[in-house]
Structure formats: C-alpha cells, structure tokens
A protein has these predicted regions:
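Transmembrane-helix signature of polytopic, membrane-embedded enzymes
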Residues: 13, 94-116, 135-136
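Transmembrane-helix motifs of polytopic, lipid-linked glycan transferases
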Residues: 16, 81-101, 140-144
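Short helix- or helix-capping micro-motifs
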Residues: 19, 110-116, 169, 173
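Membrane-interface transmembrane helices that cradle and orient dolichyl/undecaprenyl
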Residues: 99-105, 141-161
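Short acidic/glycine- and proline-prone juxtamembrane loop motifs at membrane-interface regions
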Residues: 125-133
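Transmembrane-lumen/periplasm boundary regions of multi-pass, lipid-linked membrane glycan transferases
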Residues: 171, 182-307
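Signature aromatic-anchored transmembrane alpha helix within multi-pass, membrane-resident enzymes
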Residues: 331-370
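Aromatic/acidic, Gly/Pro-rich catalytic loop(s) in extracytoplasmic/lumenal soluble domains
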Residues: 398, 402-406, 438-527
C-alpha cells in the first residue's frame, strides 16, 4: 500500500514538473507577442459581454474577464493567462483519464503528444481563442464519458459521471457550437453498443443539462434573428459553390501541420491498427473514441471541398486520437522501446523548434515572407505582421496628436473609424481604447461582426472629431465614405519598423464635417 501511494506521489511530482516546464516555455511568447487578429477581436467579448455574440458563444469573453479581473489587468500576458492555465489543467485531466482507461504508460505518452501538438499547446494552449475553453471542457467531458458509457451495467457512479459529461459538454458548447460532436459520439455508441443506457433516467437528465446550458446562445439568437447560425451556415454550406480543390488541400495540409506531422502519422497508424483488429479484440473505449472523433473530421473535410474551411475546426476531435494512439504506443513500447522514444522525441523537438522559430520570426522577421508589395500594400503577404507593430502605431498616433496640439482631455469627442473587424479590433485595443477614443466600425455586418452591436453602444455624433485609420496589410481607401464628409485629408503615415527595416505602414486620415444620417453600405442609422 505504501509503495503504491509513493508511486502515485512520484508520478504526480514528475507530471507537475513536466506541466511547469511546458508552462515556463510558453510564458515568454505569451508575454512578448502582440495579440493576433482573433485574440484582439475576442477581447471585445470581454469589453462588451453578452449572452452570446455574432460569431461565437460567450465563453472566451468570460474567460478573458475572469483572468484579467474584468479587464483591470492589462496586457497580452493577462489576456492569454486563461489559455496557459486551462491548457496546463487539461494535461493533468488527460493524464488521469488515460491512466484510468488504459495504463500509466499510455497516460505519459498521451500528455507528451498533447504537449507536442501545435493545436493543443499553442493555438488553444497559448493564444486566447474560443478553442481554449472548448478543449478544456472537451477533455473534462471525455474524462466522465469514457468510464461511464462503456459500462455494461451502469450504476449510480456511472450515471453521475454521465450527467457530468452532459454538464461539461454544455460548457464546451458555450465555447464553440460544434462541441456537440461529443453527444453525437455518445449517442451513436449507445445505439450501437450499449442500449441499456436508453432505460436510464440519467441519460435523459444529462441531455437536459446540456440543453439548459445552451439557453443563453439560443436566447441571444432569438433576439437577433438567429444571425449566428445563418452566418456559420453561409461559411460551410455545401450547396452554395462548386468543388474547390484548393480549399480541400489547404484544409488537409493545415490539419496535419496543426496537429504536428509526426503525430498525425501516428494517429493514422494507430487508427488503422484498431480498424483491422478482430471484433473481440477491440477495446470498447477505442470504439467510443473512434465513433466520437471520426465523424467531425469527415464532416469538415467534406465542407472543405466546397468552402474555405479552417484546419483548427476539427482540432478537439484529435483528443480522441491522442488517447487511442497513446494506448497503441504503450503496447508497442515493450517491443520497440527505442523507436517509440525517438518518435515522441522528434515530435517534441519539432514543437519546440516551431514555437521558438515562430516567436523569433514575429519579433525579428529574420525570414523574408512574401514578395515586395506596393507602398500602400507593404507587408500584405507577411501574416506574422498581424502580431507586430501595434504598440509602435499607438506611439506614432500619440506623437501625431501632440504635433496637432490635440490634448488628451479633448479625446472623449474623438472617434476613429474602420471598415472591417480586422484591423478594427487591433486599432481599438492598441490605439483607441488606451487613449479613451471611441472606435466605430462601418460596413455590412459580415465585415464588422460584433462591432455592429458595439457601434450602437458607443455612438457617433456629427460634432465628433473623426479619423480614419487603415494599414498597408489591409489597406482600404477612405474614399468609400467620401459622400458623408466635406473633405478627407491624408494626415500622417506611421512607419512600423522591425529589425530596423520598414515592414508596414499605418495611414491616418482626417475626416472633416460628417454630414450623413446613415453610412453607405452600413446597417447603421446614427441620427
């Protein structure tokens, strides 16, 4: 007994060391990298909380509010703190899940693969995205689903676990809609392999718990003509366009890269090994994981044939394949110990290399990305510039205001306008909000997203001093608004330097004598 307790303590100690090391490695980029397009946009969810939002449920905004103490703590590190904490917690939960279902050795392999995955450890584990809480709640949901629904004779404990599965699936839904793939997997498994659950009241209670947690999203959408669902339907609808081999290729290669190419190959091998087994030899947990993970990947792969589909949309499903592959590697370890160690070491090395190289690239631009562009499109093809130069832009704008003799006390009557949610959110977070300036995004709702609701809160007056700001990466001429102003004057150009070289430009325009009651191509009527 003492030996067993000692072994568990030692196991927990080493696991804690691994999690801490992983956390320390990620703290540096979390603190020094400026926010990406999506991250800075989700900051607006915390700034203007609601039951739900145009493009996603509310959980990511709530998470930002929680870890910034309702935005009282400022800076990139605190925006991302929730991602660092939840991803670390997910590692612990995953370890004990896999240990309970398979073995301690499989659990170690699972957490090493989780840490080596670019999606789980960077995209959702470093950056603050809706995937961040989604992954955490999906891991928790699986923690309670796997040992309960596979039981041939579920008792009180299994039923309680299944209800908790419904609870955490509901929270995952409040992060991203397609988290309901968990219920699809659980339901299919019950219908095919374990119909005794259909006689258990706990099964239906778990469904009710999930449905209750979905109420905020449906309430908000009911008030807003179900605009979130029509928006996403237009993004992934199968019958609105022709077959697109480019989007299909981009999705599949992106999916492979996001998971780490080394791991992706392992996932395929492990899955094939399970599928070719004879039925009596297949573990029930393996069946459940395959039924849960495969459909989501197949569905989004099908979508990618017709529409641009982002590779991270299938990300949470790969938790199932990490668990399956962990068991496969644990079984292979006794026969091919060196091979297993080398493969996982390669995956870890590749992860560290990408994290370090990516951070250095964003901060220094040591790799030339994209061809030289015209002056007003400088940096257009360098995606790393989304996360660079915005602090310089604020300094440049403050310098411009100082040269113009505009005092900080008069900025409450100043407005910056933009015409797209990006770079509007960057301009808002790094320039407008710190200076007490209102940012208004003008355009149709597909372009401005949540700013449609933010604009109505902030308002725009004809007496406001108005600037239009755009950048060379996303340049849009202010001439689209010319009919509403007596004149539009180029006021200043801010040069963004990286490694002592100009890499993009921020353009400031003075918009004089605003005269429109509504804006062309915009849903707003301000007066």
């Amino acid at each position: 007994m003492e030996t067993s307790i000692s072994a568990r303590r030692r196991e927990t100690y080493y696991l804690s060391i691994l999690v801490l090391l992983n956390l320390l490695i990620k703290i540096i980029p979390a603190a020094i990298l400026e926010l990406g397009n999506d991250e800075v946009y989700y900051w607006t969810y915390a700034l203007f909380p609601d039951w739900s939002h145009f493009d996603h449920p509310p959980m990511v905004g709530l998470l930002i509010q929680l870890f910034t103490f309702n935005l009282h703590l400022h800076g990139e590190f605190f925006i991302r703190l929730g991602a660092l904490i939840l991803s670390s917690a997910s590692i612990f939960i995953l370890f004990y899940l896999v240990k309970r279902v398979y073995s301690s050795r499989a659990a170690w392999f699972a957490v090493i693969m989780f840490i080596s995955s670019f999606y789980f450890n960077i995209i959702s584990g470093l950056f603050m995205l809706p995937d961040t809480p989604q992954v955490f709640f999906v891991v928790l949901a699986l923690y309670f689903l796997l040992p309960s629904v596979t039981s041939p004779n579920p008792g009180r404990k299994e039923i309680s676990n299944f209800i908790l599965f419904g609870f955490f699936t509901g929270l995952a839904f409040l992060s991203k809609y397609h988290s309901l793939f968990l219920w699809a997997g659980a339901g299919l498994y019950i219908l095919i392999k374990n119909r005794i659950w259909l006689k258990k009241p706990g099964f239906y209670l778990s469904i009710i718990v999930t449905l209750i947690l979905m109420i905020p999203v449906f309430y908000w959408n009911y008030k807003n003509n179900f605009i979130s669902f029509t928006f996403h339907e237009n993004r992934v609808g199968l019958f609105h366009s022709h077959i697109n081999p480019v989007s299909f290729s981009q999705f599949n290669f992106g999916e492979m890269f996001y998971q780490n190419p080394v791991l992706f190959v392992l996932f395929i091998i492990a899955t094939i090994r399970i599928l070719i087994k004879k039925k009596p030899d297949i573990n029930q947990a393996d069946i459940l994981l395959l039924i849960t993970g495969i459909p989501l990947i197949v569905i989004f792969t099908l979508f990618s044939l017709f529409h641009t589909t982002l590779p991270h949309w299938t990300g949470p499903a790969f938790i199932c394949f990490i668990i399956i592959t962990a068991e496969y590697l644990a079984n292979m370890y006794n026969l091919k110990r060196k091979a297993v160690i080398r493969i996982l070491s390669l995956a870890l090395i590749l992860f560290v290399a990408v994290l370090v190289t990516g951070t250095l690239q964003i901060e220094t631009g040591f790799i030339s990305i994209g061809k030289n562009q015209k002056y007003d499109h400088t940096g257009k093809n360098d995606f790393t510039l989304d996360m660079y130069g915005w602090k310089q832009a604020r300094e440049g704008f403050e310098d411009y205001l100082s040269r113009e003799g505009i005092s900080k006390g008069s900025l409450k009557n100043t407005v910056i306008i933009s015409d797209n949610w990006f770079p509007a959110a960057h301009i808002d977070y790094y320039i407008a909000y710190p200076l007490g300036i209102r940012l208004i995004a003008l355009g149709n709702i597909e372009r401005i997203h949540k700013y449609y609701w933010i604009d109505r809160r902030r308002g725009l007056k004809k007496t406001d001093r108005i600037f239009y700001i755009t950048d060379s990466r996303n340049f849009h001429s202010p001439d689209q608004f010319r009919s509403c102003f007596s004149s539009i004057i180029p006021a200043d150009t801010i040069v963004i330097n990286r490694n002592k070289k100009p890499v993009k430009y921020i353009y400031i325009y003075k918009m004089n004598d605003f005269s429109c009651d509504s804006i062309p191509n915009s849903p707003h009527v301000f007066f």
